[in-house]
Amino acid sequence: MSTTSIESNNDIGRSVKTIGVYSIGPEIGKGSFATVYKCFNTKTNESVAIKSVVRSKLKSKKLVENLEIEISILKTMKHPHIVGLLDYKQTTSHFHLVMDYCSMGDLSYFIRKRNQLIKTHPVISSLLERYPSPEGSHGLNEVLVIHFLKQLVSALEFLRNKSLVHRDIKPQNLLLCPPLHSKQEFKDGGFVGLWELPLLKIADFGFARFLPSTSMAETLCGSPLYMAPEILRYEKYNAKADLWSVGAVLYEMTVGKPPFRADNHVQLLKNIEKSNDRIKFPSAAQVPESLKRLIRSLLKYNPTERVSFNEFFNDPLIVNDLEGNDEPLETSEMDENLFISEYISPIKSSQKSQYIEPITTEVAVKEKSKQDLPAREVSTHASESQTKAVDTRPSSRDEEIKEIINKNSPGPETSRSIQPHNLKEKSLVLKNKDNDIILERDYVVVEKRAVEVNAIADELAHAGSGAVAINPRRTSSGSDNSYNGPNNMQLYRRPSLRSNSSGSQRRPSFTDRRISISISPTNALTKAIGLASNRLFGVNASGSPTNRLIEETDERLAINENNSSMNATNNTFSTILSNPNFANNLLIQKLNLPTSATVANNSQTNTSPQLSPQSKTDESVLNRLESLATKAHAINLFADVKFSQLIPSPPSSDALDDDLLHQNDMLPPKIVKSISEEGVVLYVKTLSLLAKGMVIASDWWYSQFEIDDPSNKNSNENPLKQSSNNNSDDLSLAVRINELVQWIREKFNECLEKAEFIRLTLQEANTLLSNEDSSEYMGNSNSVADKTRVVAEKLIFDRALEMSRNAAVNELVKEDLKGCELAYSTAIWMLEALLDEDSSNDEDRLDDEDKAMVEKFIVSIGNRLSVLKRKLEVV
């Protein structure tokens, strides 16, 4: 086998041009351990799919065994309705499985995207014109359902004869190929169904096992939404588990959604048990009785009551001939080499789906920052040494915080029923319509603030020269190379940022925003966060060109403690909440937390009587901005957890099996609505805190005109340029304020776009709910869950207390003490955010009793944090 000499461990598509005789094409699929590429044989010019499995990710014996079994099974699988293994290659870093290329994607994609594909894909257009879905139905035409069923059964019967159980039957593993060109070719190939329709093939045998009919297995595997209840109960099971999965897939083909849905395994099993074998079909789906009967026989809770394989294989729907048109579909304009997603036209910037595909979790961005960027961006990234050091990425610490928040997150349904821990729920119960109006009103207010936020940030940015924004106040003693020169200005004023003339204009794509934040953050942004970190946490943390693990960060901070007297403007840090050594001066005063010598020295220095009156004012403003920024950042991470639940998440953990990545692919509209409502109010809360910070910055900025030019004779000049004689403290504080303002602006715009995405998702969920049978989605229309208005304050309060409780339990058993410290710190900031209310919104303001209770919890958690910090110092 001949390959190029360079091969990446994570993404062969960026470095390897060929694998043997196969030329590597674009990526068409991705899982936890493997990436699928569209390739073609350079000798025959035939398209193939290559599944490349990264060796380094197969860290357990079980994973290697799964791959070996999949390969051994596929080598013996020669069936027209099973994806064939054409070739197999190995390198030092990858296993490459060369397989049949199925250009029409998977069944799940076909069901979900057919309304878009009908406009652009010639075969699907012809297919759905001939066999349209019933009016008002989200499912497929009866003929298509039975056609695909026949082909699926043909493959299962073949597996059954070989004593194989697939264990992961789901729409994502049922791939589609274009119809064959003639009826004779169809017969010669041994296919079943209608010759003129697309072909279905079973794929992904990673969980398959040789399991004789008398044997039982007990491994939890497969996709939760299609798992048999005996697997969900962790009981032993046999091949009949596949029959349940077939029933679930068949139901989805007829109705357009899985028969049972939930946000976790436990709730899914409860929903299945609650149904008591009563499978309901929406009237709009117009499912024929014969199909209903078959589906119900497959979806029997008790495996012994489930239809047998013999009965299933001999069902009249399967054995009887299916009458078709016997005329070929329109294929003249189809290019069989194009993958199905390539037929969907570019998405308009106004459509929400622009946000979905490019979104990745911060961890994924961290792992893929180099290989996933276009070549020109990679080279830019490599050449910008300062930026590279800056991009130590907030993901390491932020992702840990998100994990802590998510770990303590009840499901969307559960969270509605949690008592508010004595936090009053005055006016929380409203009609859905009123709730939507309130969400819309809050969102519109935030949208309007975007103009003001960007305007003041632009004015500050242009006051000096980019990153040097208030440069005229600099003195020689305060010079810093990182602020000088045009390069930093160019980095800061990169094209993806809003210009002064378009401060209120939205970015055309979320992709640009993610790249600008995660890949090429500005020097000013990093400086701002680093400076804020110094004040907030009392530690001078030096930057790192790589995203070190938390333990490494803590060690580095301990080492750098001796260097704490360095000027704060020389520090770089990746995020406001990046240091668990939580010692914000504001909280020190309130909670009487222990302070290190470093913090004490910094505090004494910062409050030195040598500071000019202007410096004292600037320092006060900086303190307020840093406090608001940190509170906003904590709530933003909570909101990001909700955001990540609504988008297709790329694999972020080697421990995740591929099937688990599809849990959120098709969440029930009711769950989507619940998550979206929570996400919107959390982002609105974040935005209100950030906007409040910008108001403070605006007042400070315009007060400079009055200070420097009371007579207002030179109001058109930058007042700071008239203060060249100010000392270095004045200059340093002003620059730090400006940098923090730019960070707030960037975070504000990012949150606004995410809130917009969630708002559109919420609208879509509401539309689906209004169109569906109320008994299917809404349950009891008088239920509290359907009337409860989502309030950010309650969500934040509940989550902060849950985090601190779990941290206390872990602390008692001496488990993950660093994580406990981070959980306590984050919980305190979240509760502090509750006390920082929006003066313009009286409806959700806490009364005095509630405020006193929140403050009590802050003190209580702060005391726990104080005790824990002393423990860690001893350790």
UniProtKB/Swiss-Prot annotation:
Enzyme class: transferase
Key words, A-Z: ATP-binding, Autophagy, Cytoplasm, Kinase, Membrane, Nucleotide-binding, Protein transport, Serine/threonine-protein kinase, Transferase, Transport
Cross-referenced InterPro entries: Atg1-like, ATG1-like_MIT2, Atg1-like_tMIT, Kinase-like_dom_sf, Prot_kinase_dom, Protein_kinase_ATP_BS, Ser/Thr_kinase_AS
UniProt GO MF annotations: ATP binding; protein serine kinase activity; protein serine/threonine kinase activity
Record region (Disordered): 367-422, 470-515
Membrane topology, record value: Peripheral membrane protein
GO annotation, biological process: autophagosome assembly; autophagy of mitochondrion; filamentous growth; piecemeal microautophagy of the nucleus; protein transport; regulation of autophagy; response to starvation; reticulophagy
Biased composition (Polar residues): 380-389, 406-420, 473-490, 497-508
Binding site for ATP: I28, G29, K30, G31, S32, F33, A34, T35, V36, K51
Active site per database record: D168
Main location class: cytoplasm
CDD domains: STKc_ATG1_ULK_like
Signal sequence bounds: none
Catalytic activity: L-seryl-[protein] + ATP = O-phospho-L-seryl-[protein] + ADP + H(+); L-threonyl-[protein] + ATP = O-phospho-L-threonyl-[protein] + ADP + H(+)
Domain Protein kinase: 22-318
EC number: 2.7.11.1
Transport keyword on record: yes
Subcellular location: Cytoplasm; Preautophagosomal structure membrane
Superkingdom to which the source organism belongs: Eukaryota
Its biological purpose: Serine/threonine protein kinase involved in the cytoplasm to vacuole transport (Cvt) and found to be essential in autophagy, where it is required for the formation of autophagosomes. Involved in the clearance of protein aggregates which cannot be efficiently cleared by the proteasome. Required for selective autophagic degradation of the nucleus (nucleophagy) as well as for mitophagy which contributes to regulate mitochondrial quantity and quality by eliminating the mitochondria to a basal level to fulfill cellular energy requirements and preventing excess ROS production.
Family, similarity comment: Belongs to the protein kinase superfamily. Ser/Thr protein kinase family. APG1/unc-51/ULK1 subfamily.
Subunit structure: Homodimer. Forms a ternary complex with ATG13 and ATG17.
PANTHER family assigned: NON-SPECIFIC SERINE_THREONINE PROTEIN KINASE, SERINE/THREONINE-PROTEIN KINASE UNC-51-RELATED
Protein name in UniProt: Serine/threonine-protein kinase ATG1
Annotated organism of origin: Debaryomyces hansenii (strain ATCC 36239 / CBS 767 / BCRC 21394 / JCM 1990 / NBRC 0083 / IGC 2968)
Gene designation: ATG1
